Design a protein with these regions (language model features):
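Active-site bordering "gate/hinge" segments
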Residues: 1-209
């Protein structure tokens, strides 16, 4: 567990080093993961503390205002009904208009301005992904909401404006990230063997390999 944690945090540190960014300026790191890896996350938190970083961990959004289609950003659990997530990915079509987007953008800007000191010392995400899930082929339902042309343009505008706001307060040239992936039991009967092999590859000496 400790070796896996150190591999993760060292990858984060090296990301800053290779891009010539000063990690010592940063105080927080955003850990994102799938539930079930808490033992590893706890070890990662301690390893990040050795780098002078404290974790920021939050649940992936489930409300229509903040979630990103059916993409999970944060910590999340197994999904018992992927079709439902797919069907409801555009539920914001119920209320999205120009006034809403303007207000949402303003609220995001205000939140970052109020917390600009914290944003300035945020280092970026450390992401633990999973693989081996049973393939999902969604069905297109006529009853599901969709964005009309105007709403699609508003959605793109918000994404662009939100990205600019984030980059203003958490400067891209000063932040980095790391990503690692592990299999989950859905991958099949030889899960343990695959998991052990993945750990072996992930923890190889990076100076040698």
């Amino acid at each position: 567990i400790q070796k896996m944690a150190d591999t993760f945090t060292e990858g984060y540190r090296i990301g800053f080093e290779l891009t010539g960014k000063d990690l010592s300026k940063k105080k927080t790191v955003n850990i994102r993961y799938c539930l079930g890896f808490e033992r590893l996350v706890r070890a990662e938190i301690k390893s990040f503390e050795k780098l002078g970083l404290k974790p920021t961990i939050y649940r992936a959004a489930v409300n229509t205002i903040n979630k990103r289609l059916n993409i999970k950003v944060g910590y999340y659990g197994a999904n018992p009904n992927k079709q439902m997530d797919f069907d409801h990915r555009f539920d914001n079509a119920l209320y999205m208009d120009g006034e809403f987007i303007e207000r949402k953008t303003g609220a995001l800007k205000l939140a970052y301005e109020k917390n600009k000191e914290l944003a300035a010392v945020h280092g970026g995400p450390a992401v633990m992904e999973v693989f081996g899930e049973v393939p999902f082929e969604p069905q297109i339902k006529s009853e599901a909401l969709t964005l009309d042309t105007k709403q699609q343009k508003l959605s793109v505008k918000y994404s662009n404006d939100a990205g600019s706001i984030v980059n203003e307060y958490i400067k891209g040239e000063e932040r980095s990230f790391t990503i690692i992936a592990y299999p989950i039991p859905e991958i099949g009967g030889n899960f343990e063997e695959i998991f052990e092999g993945t750990v072996k590859i992930n923890t190889l000496d990076y100076n040698k390999y």
